[in-house]
């Protein structure tokens, strides 16, 4: 029986409350359309935390300087561009802030309209649902229906979170979708792939057999029938361990043992220091040479007696 955990996957069934991730506008000629952006996809990867094997407490990562090995706080860290190995151009917060203000126009500017088939999917990056902003419903509907009627998509420039990107605008179901796409210099050339043969070296029989197999496996695309079997198996394994009570609890924070050890060491060092003058060698204590011989012997015997009485 295939059982998949539901309580522990943090998934909500039914209506999903869309979180507005960006507000701005689409510039379409002289038309300005207020919009809101929403994430169109979500990461379903199962997040596994790294734990200390001995006590199952989560581990943490610290930002450490590779030179002085000092753990750094956020205000001690700056950004830098490595122009050659080990050499950097430092960019201050003021540098980055001024650049952000220059390019963060909160507008998606449509610059061209093209056919979707002209863009290879290798350029596609991330998808966003575009919803109408305040008082933008009519203009939004106009753009959507114009795109639907012409079968065209819009090519646009946009800036989100200080990053300028190229994007397309198209109709998906009854909604406008914006997809960020890569710039040409971000797409590597297929000619750089090693080992790819330049010419075909298959015979007609082999080719026809492969075509027949493709024809037999050809079907209508139904995304619902494709599943992440590894994720399901991992969830099942987690569920089995929960049912068998194979769980671990993060322990309470351990006391700072090193501080205690250091304190004991400091106290012991203090005790040793108080005893050290009584244990000096005769050569290191010339001041006692002026004392009468009997007084020195008597004092030494008294000290030994006290030491033996307290041991």
From Swiss-Prot:
Q: Which UniProt keywords apply?
A: DNA damage, DNA recombination, DNA repair, DNA-binding
In residue numbers, the region (Disordered) covers 269-311
Function summary: With LigD forms a non-homologous end joining (NHEJ) DNA repair enzyme, which repairs dsDNA breaks with reduced fidelity. Binds linear dsDNA with 5'- and 3'- overhangs but not closed circular dsDNA nor ssDNA. Recruits and stimulates the ligase activity of LigD. Probably involved in DNA repair during spore germination.
Predominant place of localization:
other
- This chain belongs to the protein called Non-homologous end joining protein Ku
> What triggers or suppresses the expression of this protein?
Transcriptionally regulated by SpoVT and sigma-G factor.
> What spans are recorded as compositionally biased (Basic residues)?
301-311
Q: What happens when the gene is disrupted?
A: Stationary-phase cells lacking this gene are more sensitive to ionizing radiation. Growth rate, ultraviolet light and methyl-methanesulfonate sensitivities are unaffected. The spores formed are significantly more sensitive to dry heat, high vacuum-induced desiccation, X-rays and UV radiation, but no difference in hydrogen peroxide resistance exists.
What the record says about family reads: Belongs to the prokaryotic Ku family.
- Looking at the record's lineage, which domain of life comes first? Bacteria
The subcellular localization recorded is:
Spore core
Assembly, in brief, is: Homodimer. Interacts with LigD.
User: What sequence ranges are listed for the domain Ku?
Assistant: 26-210
Bias class Low complexity marks the residues at: 282-293
Q: Which GO terms describe its biological process?
A: DNA recombination; double-strand break repair via nonhomologous end joining
GO MF term (any one): double-stranded DNA binding
